[in-house]
Amino acid sequence: VVQSHRRDDRAEVAHISSADTIYKIDSDIDPILIDFCNDWSKSTPLVLVAEGLADENGIEGPRVFPCGMKIEDAEIQVIVDPIDGTRGIMYDKRSAWSLAGVAPNRGAATRLREIEVSVMTELPTSKAGRADVLSAIRGQGVVCRRVDLRDQSIEHFHPQTSSATSIDHGFASVSNFFPGTKLLASELMEFIVARLIGRADVTRATVFDDQY
């Protein structure tokens, strides 16, 4: 993904799925993901759930590995968003994230709360020097690593939750990335601020907004 910043075609539309617009930078990941699942399924039959993914017949939906296996016979479901934040990273504007989770396969009854292993990996911009990787196994806590992109050295760190008791002098956001939702989102943000700290004083600007 970092190397793709040098290409001019990464922002081209590859196709329109039922869930979103799929760009070239997204579709370039699919063959890599499919090859990985083909190899993994030799030892662990799995169901891959990913946005815009289609089966051999071009039908969007979960894909079973190895090919030909019934979905109910797979051991696990792998839920993946290879690039969460496509639009920011494809213009080299800000980091995106690669998200993955693994849950026991219960077919259509499988729920996100049943995920046993999860990994969140930063996909940095071309000018970044380091990238964060956060992973967790149910019952075993979280492992956080910061990878130096120059020499692949790793530094461990421990994220902490904020101790703030108010949103005053802090960030508060209602995501509204696309036109069509901005008016409602703005009204909701104003309502939240008014309920939590009272009417916002624009001369003080004590509540900050950051869509990312």
Protein language model features and the residues they cover:
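Short, flexible, glycine/charge-rich loop motifs used to bind or transfer phosphoryl groups or to couple energy/partner
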Residues: 66-68, 108, 160-162
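DPxDG-like acidic metal-binding loop motif
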Residues: 71-139
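Short amphipathic alpha-helical surface micro-motifs
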Residues: 28-31, 79-84, 116, 150-157
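Alpha-helix termini
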Residues: 4-5, 38-45, 104-110, 125-126, ...
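Alpha-helix capping and helix-coil boundary motifs
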Residues: 17, 108-111, 166
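N-terminal subdomain of lithium-sensitive/metallo-dependent phosphomonoesterases centered on the IMPase/IPPase/PAP
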Residues: 1-83, 208-211
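An extended, acidic
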Residues: 2, 115-117, 121-212
